[in-house]
Protein backbone atom coordinates (compact mmCIF):
# COMPACT_ATOMS: atom_id res chain seq x y z
CA UNK A 1 0.00 0.00 0.00
CA UNK A 2 1.31 3.44 -0.95
CA UNK A 3 0.32 5.37 2.12
CA UNK A 4 -0.04 9.13 1.90
CA UNK A 5 2.27 10.72 4.46
CA UNK A 6 1.31 14.09 5.90
CA UNK A 7 3.11 16.59 8.12
CA UNK A 8 1.32 19.28 10.07
CA UNK A 9 4.13 21.59 11.06
CA UNK A 10 7.65 21.39 9.70
CA UNK A 11 10.20 22.99 11.99
CA UNK A 12 13.76 21.76 12.46
CA UNK A 13 12.77 18.26 13.52
CA UNK A 14 10.05 17.96 10.89
CA UNK A 15 12.52 19.01 8.21
CA UNK A 16 15.06 16.48 9.46
CA UNK A 17 12.48 13.70 9.10
CA UNK A 18 11.10 15.01 5.82
CA UNK A 19 14.62 15.13 4.41
CA UNK A 20 15.11 11.45 5.19
CA UNK A 21 11.75 10.47 3.70
CA UNK A 22 12.33 12.20 0.37
CA UNK A 23 15.66 10.37 0.04
CA UNK A 24 13.97 6.96 0.45
CA UNK A 25 13.69 4.87 -2.71
CA UNK A 26 10.33 3.35 -1.74
CA UNK A 27 8.50 6.61 -0.95
CA UNK A 28 7.32 8.89 -3.75
CA UNK A 29 7.38 12.63 -3.22
CA UNK A 30 3.86 12.60 -4.69
CA UNK A 31 2.74 10.74 -1.56
CA UNK A 32 3.97 13.42 0.85
CA UNK A 33 2.05 16.56 1.83
CA UNK A 34 3.13 19.22 4.33
CA UNK A 35 1.32 22.13 5.95
CA UNK A 36 3.11 25.11 7.48
CA UNK A 37 1.96 28.36 9.06
CA UNK A 38 2.96 30.77 6.30
CA UNK A 39 2.79 30.82 2.52
CA UNK A 40 6.50 31.65 2.35
CA UNK A 41 7.50 28.60 4.41
CA UNK A 42 5.15 26.37 2.39
CA UNK A 43 6.76 27.56 -0.85
CA UNK A 44 10.22 26.97 0.62
CA UNK A 45 9.27 23.40 1.57
CA UNK A 46 8.03 22.79 -1.97
CA UNK A 47 11.21 24.23 -3.49
CA UNK A 48 13.64 22.41 -1.19
CA UNK A 49 11.98 19.00 -0.92
CA UNK A 50 9.79 18.72 -4.01
CA UNK A 51 6.67 17.75 -2.08
CA UNK A 52 3.17 19.20 -2.03
CA UNK A 53 2.85 21.96 0.56
CA UNK A 54 0.01 24.08 1.88
CA UNK A 55 -0.93 26.42 4.71
CA UNK A 56 -4.20 24.53 5.31
CA UNK A 57 -3.92 21.90 8.06
CA UNK A 58 -7.31 20.42 7.20
CA UNK A 59 -6.08 19.56 3.71
CA UNK A 60 -3.30 17.42 5.16
CA UNK A 61 -5.60 15.85 7.75
CA UNK A 62 -8.06 14.72 5.08
CA UNK A 63 -5.43 13.23 2.77
CA UNK A 64 -2.97 11.56 5.13
CA UNK A 65 -2.89 7.85 5.89
CA UNK A 66 0.07 8.55 8.14
CA UNK A 67 -0.09 11.91 9.89
CA UNK A 68 2.94 13.40 11.60
CA UNK A 69 1.98 16.06 14.15
CA UNK A 70 5.16 18.11 14.17
CA UNK A 71 3.99 21.38 15.74
CA UNK A 72 5.32 22.84 18.98
CA UNK A 73 3.75 21.32 22.11
CA UNK A 74 1.92 24.52 23.02
CA UNK A 75 0.07 24.45 19.66
CA UNK A 76 -0.90 20.80 19.91
CA UNK A 77 -4.34 21.11 21.45
CA UNK A 78 -5.31 23.93 19.08
CA UNK A 79 -4.24 21.96 16.01
CA UNK A 80 -6.01 18.80 17.14
CA UNK A 81 -9.21 20.77 17.72
CA UNK A 82 -8.94 21.99 14.13
CA UNK A 83 -8.39 18.58 12.51
CA UNK A 84 -9.92 15.96 14.83
CA UNK A 85 -13.11 15.49 12.78
CA UNK A 86 -11.22 15.34 9.47
CA UNK A 87 -8.59 12.68 10.14
CA UNK A 88 -9.25 9.30 8.53
CA UNK A 89 -10.50 6.63 10.95
CA UNK A 90 -7.64 4.27 10.04
CA UNK A 91 -4.95 6.95 9.85
CA UNK A 92 -1.82 6.37 11.91
CA UNK A 93 -1.16 9.54 13.89
CA UNK A 94 2.47 10.08 14.86
CA UNK A 95 3.36 12.70 17.47
CA UNK A 96 6.90 14.03 17.78
CA UNK A 97 6.14 16.56 20.54
CA UNK A 98 8.10 16.52 23.78
CA UNK A 99 5.96 16.57 26.90
CA UNK A 100 2.62 15.73 25.24
CA UNK A 101 1.39 12.34 26.43
CA UNK A 102 -0.58 9.62 24.70
CA UNK A 103 -3.48 10.17 27.11
CA UNK A 104 -3.54 13.91 26.41
CA UNK A 105 -3.64 13.40 22.66
CA UNK A 106 -6.36 10.75 22.90
CA UNK A 107 -8.39 13.03 25.16
CA UNK A 108 -8.06 16.00 22.79
CA UNK A 109 -9.17 13.91 19.80
CA UNK A 110 -12.12 12.64 21.85
CA UNK A 111 -12.43 9.40 19.88
CA UNK A 112 -10.61 6.15 19.18
CA UNK A 113 -7.42 6.85 17.24
CA UNK A 114 -4.35 4.96 16.11
CA UNK A 115 -1.51 6.83 17.78
CA UNK A 116 2.24 6.45 18.10
CA UNK A 117 4.10 8.87 20.32
CA UNK A 118 7.69 9.28 19.15
CA UNK A 119 10.78 11.25 19.95
CA UNK A 120 13.38 11.54 17.17
CA UNK A 121 16.53 13.65 17.17
CA UNK A 122 18.04 15.91 14.52
CA UNK A 123 20.67 13.44 13.19
CA UNK A 124 17.62 11.84 11.54
CA UNK A 125 18.29 14.25 8.66
CA UNK A 126 21.43 12.27 7.75
CA UNK A 127 19.97 8.85 8.55
CA UNK A 128 21.77 8.57 11.88
CA UNK A 129 19.03 9.53 14.32
CA UNK A 130 18.00 7.70 17.47
CA UNK A 131 14.27 7.66 18.12
CA UNK A 132 11.91 6.32 20.77
CA UNK A 133 8.45 5.11 19.79
CA UNK A 134 5.47 4.24 21.99
CA UNK A 135 2.21 2.95 20.41
CA UNK A 136 -1.22 3.23 21.97
CA UNK A 137 -3.46 0.18 22.30
CA UNK A 138 -5.07 0.61 18.88
CA UNK A 139 -1.89 0.16 16.86
CA UNK A 140 -1.53 -3.33 15.37
CA UNK A 141 1.77 -5.18 15.15
CA UNK A 142 1.88 -4.62 11.38
CA UNK A 143 1.23 -0.90 11.85
CA UNK A 144 3.97 -0.66 14.47
CA UNK A 145 6.36 -2.44 12.11
CA UNK A 146 5.44 0.04 9.38
CA UNK A 147 6.14 3.00 11.66
CA UNK A 148 9.41 1.30 12.61
CA UNK A 149 10.30 1.02 8.92
CA UNK A 150 9.87 4.79 8.59
CA UNK A 151 12.01 5.44 11.64
CA UNK A 152 14.69 3.12 10.26
CA UNK A 153 15.02 5.68 7.46
CA UNK A 154 15.95 8.22 10.12
CA UNK A 155 18.52 5.93 11.81
CA UNK A 156 17.62 3.58 14.64
CA UNK A 157 14.71 3.35 17.07
CA UNK A 158 13.65 1.67 20.28
CA UNK A 159 10.12 0.86 21.43
CA UNK A 160 9.86 2.29 24.96
CA UNK A 161 7.23 2.62 27.62
CA UNK A 162 6.01 6.18 27.86
CA UNK A 163 7.36 6.57 31.39
CA UNK A 164 10.88 6.28 29.97
CA UNK A 165 10.47 9.14 27.49
CA UNK A 166 11.80 11.77 29.89
CA UNK A 167 15.07 9.85 30.20
CA UNK A 168 15.18 9.29 26.44
CA UNK A 169 14.64 12.98 25.69
CA UNK A 170 17.50 13.91 28.01
CA UNK A 171 19.82 11.17 26.73
CA UNK A 172 19.07 11.21 22.99
CA UNK A 173 16.57 13.89 22.03
CA UNK A 174 18.62 16.77 23.41
CA UNK A 175 22.08 15.22 23.41
CA UNK A 176 23.10 16.33 19.90
CA UNK A 177 23.37 19.82 21.41
CA UNK A 178 25.72 18.51 24.12
CA UNK A 179 27.84 16.71 21.53
CA UNK A 180 28.03 19.79 19.29
CA UNK A 181 29.21 21.81 22.28
CA UNK A 182 31.91 19.21 22.92
CA UNK A 183 33.00 19.34 19.26
CA UNK A 184 33.11 23.13 19.43
CA UNK A 185 35.19 23.06 22.61
CA UNK A 186 37.64 20.55 21.12
CA UNK A 187 37.97 22.62 17.96
CA UNK A 188 38.54 25.79 19.99
CA UNK A 189 41.34 23.99 21.81
CA UNK A 190 42.80 22.96 18.47
CA UNK A 191 42.76 26.57 17.28
CA UNK A 192 44.42 27.65 20.51
CA UNK A 193 47.12 25.09 19.80
CA UNK A 194 47.68 26.56 16.33
CA UNK A 195 45.43 24.59 13.98
CA UNK A 196 43.36 26.35 11.30
CA UNK A 197 39.74 26.49 12.43
CA UNK A 198 38.30 24.45 9.54
CA UNK A 199 40.85 21.70 10.09
CA UNK A 200 40.26 21.75 13.85
CA UNK A 201 36.52 21.18 13.35
CA UNK A 202 37.12 18.40 10.83
CA UNK A 203 39.47 16.60 13.21
CA UNK A 204 37.14 16.99 16.20
CA UNK A 205 34.07 15.83 14.26
CA UNK A 206 35.79 12.72 12.90
CA UNK A 207 37.18 11.89 16.35
CA UNK A 208 33.64 11.93 17.80
CA UNK A 209 32.18 9.94 14.90
CA UNK A 210 34.94 7.34 14.98
CA UNK A 211 34.76 6.92 18.75
CA UNK A 212 31.00 6.37 18.70
CA UNK A 213 31.31 3.89 15.84
CA UNK A 214 34.07 2.01 17.68
CA UNK A 215 31.86 1.66 20.76
CA UNK A 216 28.87 0.51 18.69
CA UNK A 217 30.73 -1.99 16.53
CA UNK A 218 32.98 -3.55 19.18
CA UNK A 219 30.36 -3.67 21.92
CA UNK A 220 33.09 -2.88 24.43
CA UNK A 221 32.25 -0.82 27.51
CA UNK A 222 33.26 2.83 26.94
CA UNK A 223 35.40 2.65 30.08
CA UNK A 224 37.39 -0.21 28.57
CA UNK A 225 37.85 1.70 25.32
CA UNK A 226 38.96 4.76 27.28
CA UNK A 227 41.53 2.69 29.16
CA UNK A 228 42.86 1.29 25.87
CA UNK A 229 43.75 4.84 24.77
CA UNK A 230 45.43 5.75 28.06
CA UNK A 231 49.09 4.71 28.26
CA UNK A 232 50.77 4.81 31.70
CA UNK A 233 52.21 8.26 32.25
CA UNK A 234 51.05 9.33 28.78
CA UNK A 235 49.29 12.31 27.25
CA UNK A 236 45.75 10.91 27.24
CA UNK A 237 45.64 10.03 30.95
CA UNK A 238 46.84 13.57 31.67
CA UNK A 239 43.81 14.95 29.82
CA UNK A 240 41.43 12.43 31.42
CA UNK A 241 42.60 13.36 34.92
CA UNK A 242 42.08 17.05 34.14
CA UNK A 243 38.53 16.33 32.90
CA UNK A 244 37.80 14.37 36.08
CA UNK A 245 39.30 17.12 38.26
CA UNK A 246 37.01 19.66 36.61
CA UNK A 247 33.89 17.57 37.11
CA UNK A 248 33.34 16.43 33.53
CA UNK A 249 31.22 13.39 34.39
CA UNK A 250 29.20 15.14 37.07
CA UNK A 251 28.54 18.09 34.77
CA UNK A 252 27.20 15.79 32.05
CA UNK A 253 25.09 13.77 34.49
CA UNK A 254 23.68 16.93 36.05
CA UNK A 255 22.81 18.40 32.64
CA UNK A 256 21.01 15.22 31.56
CA UNK A 257 19.06 15.16 34.82
CA UNK A 258 18.10 18.84 34.41
CA UNK A 259 16.86 18.10 30.90
CA UNK A 260 14.75 15.16 32.12
CA UNK A 261 13.30 17.28 34.93
CA UNK A 262 12.33 19.99 32.45
CA UNK A 263 10.63 17.38 30.28
CA UNK A 264 8.62 16.13 33.26
CA UNK A 265 7.46 19.65 34.10
CA UNK A 266 6.45 20.76 30.60
Residue map of PLM features:
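NAD(P)-dependent Rossmann-like dehydrogenase/reductase catalytic/cofactor-binding core
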Residues: 205-266
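Short pre-catalytic strand/loop immediately N-terminal to key active-site residues, enriched for Gly-Thr
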Residues: 5, 116, 165-170, 222-227
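NAD(P)+-binding Rossmann beta1-loop-alpha1 motif at the extreme N-terminus of oxidoreductases
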Residues: 1-55, 62, 128, 191-192
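Rossmann-like NAD(P)(H) cofactor-binding subdomain of soluble oxidoreductases
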Residues: 39, 48-49, 57-62, 66-133, ...
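Internal alpha-helical scaffold of NAD(P)-dependent oxidoreductase catalytic cores
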Residues: 104, 108-114, 130-167, 180-217
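Small-residue helix-packing motif on alpha-helices
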Residues: 32, 42, 60, 196-204, ...
